[in-house]
Amino acid sequence: VAAARSRGIGLQTFKVGPDYLDPQLLASASGRPCRNLDLLLCGAPWVRQSFHWWSNQVPLSLVEGVMGLYDGRGPSSEGSSAAIALELNLPVLLMVEASRQAGSLAALVRGFRDHEPKLNIAGVVLNGVSTSRHQQLLQEAMGSIAMPVLGVIPRDESLELPSRHLGLVPPAEQEAWPQRLSQLGQKASQWLQLEKLLALMANPNQNTPQTQTQNQAQNPISWSLGTVLSKHKAHQQATHQKSEQRPCVVIAKDKAFHFCYPELPEWLEALGCQVQWWAPLEDQALPEACAALVLPGGYPELQAKELSQCKRSLGAINQHCRLGLPLYAECGGLLLLGQELLDADGEAHPMAGVLPFRAQRGALSLGYRGATPLRAGLVLRPGEQLQGHEFHRWQLQETPAQKAAEQAWRLEGWGVLARVEGWTNAALHASWLHLHWGGCPSIPLRLRDAAVAANAKRQTTQN
């Protein structure tokens, strides 16, 4: 990606699955927001609209996979990188760990190629090659199965990217990241057959049988908004009446809170909201015009001590909730709402004190979840079925604090026991579950409506 950008070529990156961290690195390398393609969270129609719309904006597109090529939900390939490639009719470049192998690699790559005959594996990049002799052995092995080798990456410790328990360290926290990115681009030009790779990444909308349909792709949010509003004509009329009202929706964003899909603020802006960013770690009050607050996920545990000392920020969140103003929180944002947060050393740090729990490290909770709302709340309605993703290592211990909300929904997933989770009331949604609003467009619509109502109530009170 960095090599293409250094040549002045526009490239749109995508990431398979619900990841928040890899997209930050890809966005930094391309200079454009990275878009997640998740069949399980968003469904195939959204994935198609998103891919074709954003890939139409620039000459090149690259989709980074997730896990192994065929790894999807549970033991299946549902939602996998292969499923995305088949859905979008894209060629696949297989990154192969080649260290300590030679002829065996031919069997492995042939297995990947033949496992799904409809999949077009256009070539491989060999990673971890030790010597020129090793490279020759590998290339002959690939030649024996007629598999093009489009790159050879030697063992190089400088390529390793720093990581922690939930994934790679974001670019904003990596030392000398711009210089590192430039060096990576130079090495890519040296080790990869860039001309052939750039040809593979050329806008697929220009050379596939579905060209007419793909070139008519809409902005996915506009398309989704039109779809959901057409189902609710009464709501569509109300939306038109509210179009001149622009409530302020504040989104937390700093080192502690940055797990936010680019579509989240785009949805709110498309619905007529004014979006403002707010850094809790800077210990500041919420913007005066704040009609609704969004607390996304992130790493509050790494800044637990600093957050606990941000009395103005924590007090602002508490006051926001006591006034009954809308608040939407996911995962790390949920942690901020508890009574206490225990850091890695077991030291307790006071949080905003909105919800009756203290949080401490626990077992890994990871995977897609089907969510069934138990009651109506800020953004949920009984009878709906939603898909989300859970990824954390926390357990919550209830405290005797005053009950502020009811349990939100029942979660089910592959290989895990069903359980009731989250908090909700008319002005609050707080849960471990990450949602992508491309798969549940009613959520931002309801949040916007709540912000409009809160704004109107405030103006009436002031008058």
Tell what function each PLM region has.
Residues 102-209, 219-236, 242:
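Internal gly/pro-rich beta-alpha loop/helix module
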Residues 159-207, 230-235, 240-241, 245, ...:
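Amide-donor transfer/coupling interface in amidating biosynthetic enzymes
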